[in-house]
Amino acid sequence: MRNFLFKSRLDSGSGTSSRYKTFRLLGIGPLIGLLGFMLFSPGASAIPAFARQYGISCSTCHAAFPRLNSFGRDFVANNYRMETWKDNTLQTGDDMLELPKVVPLALRVQAYVQSHQANNMDPATGTVADNSSWDFSSPYMIKLLSSAPLSDHISYYFAGIMSEQGANGTLFLDDAWISHDDLFGSGIGMMLGHFQLSDLMFPRETRLTAQDFLAYRMAGITYERGVTLNRDIGPANLALGVANGNGIDTSYPAGSAGYNRPETLFDNNNSKSVFGRIGADIGPVRTGLFGLTGKQPSGGAVAQYGATLTGTRETNKQVVGLDMSGDNGQLFLFGQLLWNRWDNFLDDSPNVNRSWTGGFIGADYVYSERWTYSLLYNRAMAKDFRGTNTIYEGIETNTLSTTASYYFMRNVKGIIEANFDMQPVNHSANYVGHKTKEGYLLLGLDAAF
């Protein structure tokens, strides 16, 4: 099965002068203190879930966790299993039961301290409600993960996030799906559940930077509930899918049938998003073409000072993406371009179709078993949203992130990352768009076990 999720989340992840405004480093002392801790703290020995199941090192599948190597990509394409997977199941004498000897569980924990240039500003009034030049973002995320084969052709995966970005007291399932690698002997693979549409291109969870692939978030092609079918066709791989199009945060009671009925709606309309990707290797380069058509809520009435409210209309959107990547086992290069068209989107100009473009390019260099270095350049152009006095002027992005990771162990690393914002601040009278710089300096730890 050429599973489109080219990642291993149980071992992974996944936010100057006139031009480069100086970081506000009022908390530089604690930051330096944490760096000292990172450089001199003892490493912790731990074995992530897939490594634990098969008794292998994380380096079998990862060039540097969570970045996959070629073996790791093949492991994912083989429906998240090795040929010896049955050696790790209970011998019950029942040919129709394949239970793991133990429930396969893993944890990923991230803890940071971070200096910020951005703050929490009300786009309607310009009031700064929350402003911290540095803080302890710890834990930044705790993620519980599990995955295993259930039969010769069926596997499952889920990931539950606890305390993501300070949301303490919550448990949120971001990925949860069941996959089949050969439906009815057709060679067609299927994934049913909720997952990220953008994983067809570059899984956000396997990036080495703390900074995100911003274009995916702004285009709305991350988490959805749906189904994906995929198949190899000669040298190419084709993936097609359908999703609800309303994310994974909300469900709706189906109370029309009577009092306190158990049925629940996971979508609030009949429109669905249709998406797909065709990919192929051209020499050493992996490339693909992505497309999506679907619906989204309109951008509502423009309130005083430019604050944009959520609209009530359903409007059409289309996304076209081109992705390319390649590596030699030590240097990994990747790039993504997205073209977005949002038809009749703004309620104050409902007859106008608007478009914007965005993407990123990046490089990961595995210098040694201990050190990796990464660059990630995010760029987006608001185009037709420029001058609309709406929050969508904030699509405009121009940042460069530089990251160094030190591996205490295969599965425990320290990270230092600086994000440089090259987008000029918007000094117009409204309070939307790029009102402050978004640079930061981040230090922390990332561990999977």
Model-predicted segments: where are they?
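Bacterial N-terminal signal peptides
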Residues: 27-38
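Outer membrane beta-barrel
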Residues: 69-70, 100-123, 129-248, 270-289, ...
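Short Fe-S-cluster ligation motifs
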Residues: 85-106
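Sequence/structural segment immediately N-terminal to covalent heme-attachment motifs in c-type
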Residues: 47-57
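N-terminal secretory signal peptides that target proteins for export/translocation
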Residues: 1-23
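The canonical Cys-X-X-Cys-His
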Residues: 55-65
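Outer-membrane beta-barrel pore domains
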Residues: 130-131, 176-180, 284-449
